[in-house]
Every structure is written in C-alpha cells, then in structure tokens.
C-alpha cells in the first residue's frame, strides 16, 4: 500500500462517543484497520464521551491536553480523527497539536487512490480527493508540509495531489467533464442491456465481506480477492447461466463502510448507478464479523440513500465456517444463563 522504504506514519486515533452513538469503540477498531491499510501504524487511541462533537476542535479542551501529552510520550507523528473534520476543526487542531492531522475521510480517500486501477476509477477518486481538499487548504497546507508525504498527499498512481486552489478548481472542472463522458458510456451500455431484457443482479455489501469471492465462485470472473478493506473498486460484470437456458448478469460493486465520505459517493455516482439500476441486490454479509448486524444496517442505509431502497434483495451469509466457533459461546452466568 505504500512505497518500499517509506517511513510508516506513527498515528494516534481519536474518537468521540456522543450520547446518540453507541458504536464508537467498534468504529475505532475499523479506523485502525483503515490506517494500517493506508500505510500507518497505530501507536495509541484516545476517546472522549461528549454530548456532541466540539464544533471548533473536535475534542474538548481537557482531552486535547491529554492528546498533546500522548503525542509526545508515544513519539507519534500524527493524529487521525474518526469523523470527517470541518475546515475549522482541521485548522484549529493543526495549530493546537502542531502535528499532522487527518480524519477518517482522508484515510479512506487515500486507500481508494492506491486501489484505483482503471481510468474511470482514477478519475472518480481524484475528483473526490480534490473536492475534499479544496475546502480545507488552509489547515492541510501546514499539516501536510510537516511530513511532506504519506496519507492525504497521494492521488491515484502515487501522483502528488495539487495544493494550489486555482489549479485545484481547474482540475476539478476537467475531471467532471471526463466523468460526464464516462457516465454517458455507462448509460449507453445499460440502455443496450435493457433492450436485451437480460436481468441484472448487483452484489453489494460491507467492505471485505466477500463480494468478489462470490462473483468468482459463480462466474470464474478472476476478480482480485484479498482479505483487506476495499481490495476492489471497479465494478465487474459477468454473465451467469441459470437452469432452463436463462442468463443473468452479475455485477460486483465497491464495498460500503460506516461514515462513507459524501464526496466519494458523489464522485462514484456512475459506478453506484449499477446498484440503482439493478433488478436484484445480492447482499453479502460476513457472518463471522462480531459487528455484522451493524454492518447490515450500514449497507441498508447506504442503499436507501442511493435511492435503491425497496429493491428485491437476497442476503447471502459468507464466512460461515469462521462463525461456527461463535455459535456455541456460552453466555456469562451474570447474564442470567443457567448451567
């Protein structure tokens, strides 16, 4: 995921448990996975319970002081916040902590940039990165200059991202034009598909649930399978022959995740249209994951937000072999169980 010889960033993860959220601990575990996938090593974690996220500094004053001490004690080079930071929060944190400050969105975009292989994928990722960056140049300039590279600085193909506001807006315009052409091409393909009356099933699910594995098993598609987050970004469509000489098309789509960046959803519209236009959704669930019920909820909500809620859906539980050890876990006596 990162260049050989490149020094790993030593980061502290920061999260806020609000009164309305109850998944902060699991979200921070996921953020650790994201950070490692992007090429960082987590050296510490800090969490604060608050009524709401602090509008100016994300964390409250006392927790910020604690974070400063942790940065020094653990020799950390940066902080990753578990929520998308506003431009004000990013700028204030950078000045307060005097280190590189990142957020969940920046890390996810960085991973997407490293994973993008096709020209369409690269256009979509770079557009999302630049839209995110354009609103945060003041804080990011100082923050990124501290290390000069690493998470948040790389575009698709290890291309260094632009920092000049005028050039960023010019590049965004170019990418939007290119994406319009891509979208027209996709619409043409879908139109031809509609005329053929072949039904389409889109494989959806949380990242690393096993969507590509299912596609490969059913169609021998040869799509990359890896036990990591966002192993594949670009949709792959293959024909599947059914009994009775029927045929359908199966499409593997990009995985979802909690707190999916808005800019990413907007930029990947042409790709996510595959979900909206499908006749059937095949929802792959990693049943072995301890948080699988929350992952199902995240996917369902994302699908609804995309305008695909209410479509016929088939749920496929994957990794059932890894789940059997959990089926017979005895509850604790204090939970009211009897022996």
Regions found by a protein language model. Give the residues of each.
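Conserved catalytic network of the ASCE P-loop NTPase/AAA+ motor domain
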Residues: 5-6, 72-73, 241-243, 249, ...
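N-terminal accessory targeting/assembly segments
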Residues: 1-110
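Conserved G1/Walker A P-loop phosphate-binding module
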Residues: 181-251
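Conserved small/polar residues in nucleotide/adenosyl-binding loops
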Residues: 328-335
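P-loop NTPase nucleotide-binding/switch module
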Residues: 131-199
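Conserved beta-strand/loop subsegment of P-loop NTPase cores
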Residues: 44-46, 280-283, 309-319
């Amino acid at each position: 995921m990162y260049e050989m010889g490149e020094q790993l960033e030593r980061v502290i993860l920061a999260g806020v448990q609000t009164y309305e959220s109850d998944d902060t601990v699991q979200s921070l575990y996921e953020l650790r996975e994201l950070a490692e996938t992007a090429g960082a090593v987590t050296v510490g974690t800090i969490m604060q319970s608050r009524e709401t996220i602090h509008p100016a500094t994300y964390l409250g004053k006392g927790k910020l002081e604690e974070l400063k001490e942790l940065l020094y004690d653990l020799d950390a080079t940066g902080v990753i916040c578990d929520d998308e930071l506003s431009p004000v929060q990013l700028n204030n944190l950078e000045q307060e902590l005097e280190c590189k400050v990142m957020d969940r969105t920046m890390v996810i975009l960085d991973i997407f940039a490293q994973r993008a292989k096709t020209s369409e994928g690269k256009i979509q990722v770079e557009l999302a990165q630049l839209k995110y960056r354009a609103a945060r140049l003041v804080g990011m300039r100082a923050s990124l200059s501290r290390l000069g590279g690493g998470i948040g600085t790389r575009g698709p193909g290890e291309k260094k991202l632009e920092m000049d506001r005028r050039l960023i807006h010019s590049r965004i315009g170019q990418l939007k034009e290119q994406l319009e052409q891509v979208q027209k091409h996709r619409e043409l393909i879908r139109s031809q598909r509609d005329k053929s009356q072949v039904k389409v099933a889109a494989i959806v699910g949380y990242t690393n649930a096993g969507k590509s594995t299912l596609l490969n098993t059913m169609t021998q598609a040869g799509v990359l399978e890896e036990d990591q987050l966002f192993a594949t970004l670009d949709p792959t469509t293959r024909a599947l022959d059914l009994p009775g000489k029927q045929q359908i098309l199966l499409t593997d789509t990009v995985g979802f995740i909690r707190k999916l960046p808005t800019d990413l959803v907007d930029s990947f519209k042409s790709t996510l249209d595959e979900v909206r236009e499908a006749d059937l959704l095949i929802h792959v669930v990693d049943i072995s994951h301890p948080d699988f019920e929350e992952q199902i909820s995240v996917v369902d909500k994302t699908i609804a937000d995309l305008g695909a809620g209410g479509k016929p859906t088939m749920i496929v539980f994957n990794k059932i072999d890894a789940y059997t050890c959990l089926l017979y876990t005895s509850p604790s006596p204090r939970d009211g169980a009897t022996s």
